[in-house]
Amino acid sequence: MTKRLNNVSALRCLIVVLFINLIASQAVSAGERVFMWKVDSPKATAYILGTVHMMRKEIYPLDSRIEKAFKRSDAYALEFNIDDVTNIQMGTILSDVSYGGDDTIQKHISKETYDTLQKKFVEYGFPIEYMTKFRPWFLAVTIETLEYQKLGLDPRYGIDKYFLQQAEGKKSIIELESFDSQMDLFRTMTEKDQELFLVYTLNDLEDGRKNLDILMTAWSDGDSKIMEKVMFDPLKEDRQLSRIYEKLFYERNRNMTDKIIKMLAQKGTYFVAVGAGHLVGKQGIIELLSHKGYAVRQQ
């Protein structure tokens, strides 16, 4: 999603923001721990890195422990490879994010939500009429993207993208998810949940800015407890969000864990990069692997 919201750039920003988990970092410290875990099986080793999908150029190179783990790996696994999305798939994005015919967002959200949305886009310098054809979930993602771009974050410097560029032509690349599965997250979202997602996004912008420094420090210090608290405390305050958390986090965590376990059954060294929010908490990938009997050690 750029300020012009053309098809291709909109999709790219959409994908990075969906799975960014709203984390950012300005620098990587050489502290006691990094946001990476090592998992061993009789046949394989996997390094699992919590990533940030929008970053700043100056944070590279990353901590040497992360860089060395990537270099010694045989394969690179990420959520999904945006570079492999076909033109046909790109072309379908417009029908997924917008209403057809004379339909507009006013028919699908409350007047209160619409008025708040209108004020926000006036602030961005966009005429609201330009945005009325888009679905609530897409506008929520757009707003998140614009807010983080204002803070200097850029999807071109996302950590998963950084390693993908190094892996291409040199390592096997494994997708833990797919373009269609990620789009299905929103295709199957009810109108009620879409509006809830949009309202939460609009109401959380100020707290999101305040939490950015906390998340930045948690990521660079490898502090999974603080990361979990900031990312998942909103669920304690509003149980209506449980359906959205289940769809965007927990269900995906279970599926990606199954894929990682399959990798661990095959000989090799794997470098796995997923959004940092997928690793933390009782339903995060690290805990799920531990419950399956794997020894997981933070690096």
Q: For the regions a protein language model found, what residue spans apply to each?
A:
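Alpha-helical scaffolding within the catalytic cores
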Residues: 32-34, 256
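Structured, acidic catalytic/metal-binding patches in enzyme active sites
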Residues: 36, 40-47, 52-244
